[in-house]
């Protein structure tokens, strides 16, 4: 009789330990979603408010550089805004994962949506990175000149917004891995 009770006690301790680990993973997932949200919304705002005007010879002729002059940078802003909106909405499901234990269906849904948002964010950041590279280095074969010697503030801001977006990409990858780990621990 005592050995049966001992087995039950060990099993219940294992379940409690597994439940505690799942809760920790859910809390970490919640925190990573918040941090990723601030990175994506910060990148969208930083890029969306980027504007610099340079006088040329006289006060009447000016050159301007804005993010919406280039479609790739506009796509970057939209992609970051969409992903930040998704991350805010996904916080509700992440909170449910902290409170409840049986959340396999919502975890699968979050993995699918996280992968879709990762693809969107990666494509937006990659297209913007190509434009930022051209802004810094130019392309001699096509006679595209580097503009960052003239538009210092513009180039610093678009480069900074890329950093935030790439950090969010890494965080989304971690979120996908955490959700997969949490799912695998349940089976």
From Swiss-Prot:
Its main location: membrane. Residues 46-74, 129-161 are extracellular. GO terms for cellular component: Casparian strip; plasma membrane. Residues 1-24, 96-107, 183-187 are cytoplasmic. Glycans are attached at residue 140. PANTHER family: CASP-LIKE PROTEIN, CASP-LIKE PROTEIN 1U1. Regulates membrane-cell wall junctions and localized cell wall deposition. Required for establishment of the Casparian strip membrane domain (CSD) and the subsequent formation of Casparian strips, a cell wall modification of the root endodermis that determines an apoplastic barrier between the intraorganismal apoplasm and the extraorganismal apoplasm and prevents lateral diffusion. This is Casparian strip membrane protein 5. It comes from Arabidopsis thaliana (Mouse-ear cress). The gene is CASP5.
């Amino acid at each position: 009789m005592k050995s049966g009770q001992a087995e039950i006690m060990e099993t219940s301790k294992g379940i409690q330990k597994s439940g505690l680990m799942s809760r920790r993973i859910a809390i970490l997932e919640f925190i990573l979603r918040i941090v990723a949200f601030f990175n994506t919304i910060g990148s969208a705002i930083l890029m969306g408010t980027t504007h610099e005007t340079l006088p040329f010879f006289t006060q009447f002729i000016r050159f301007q550089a804005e993010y919406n002059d280039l479609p790739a940078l506009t796509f970057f802003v939209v992609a970051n805004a969409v992903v930040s909106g998704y991350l805010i909405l996904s916080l509700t499901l992440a909170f449910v994962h902290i409170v409840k234990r049986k959340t396999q269906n919502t975890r699968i849904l979050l993995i699918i949506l996280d992968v879709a948002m990762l693809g969107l964010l990666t494509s937006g950041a990659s297209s913007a990175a190509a434009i930022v590279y051209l802004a810094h280095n130019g392309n001699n074969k096509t006679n595209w000149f580097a503009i960052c010697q003239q538009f210092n503030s513009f180039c610093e801001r678009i480069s900074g917004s890329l950093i935030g977006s790439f950090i969010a990409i890494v965080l989304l990858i971690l979120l996908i891995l955490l959700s997969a780990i949490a799912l695998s621990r349940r089976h």
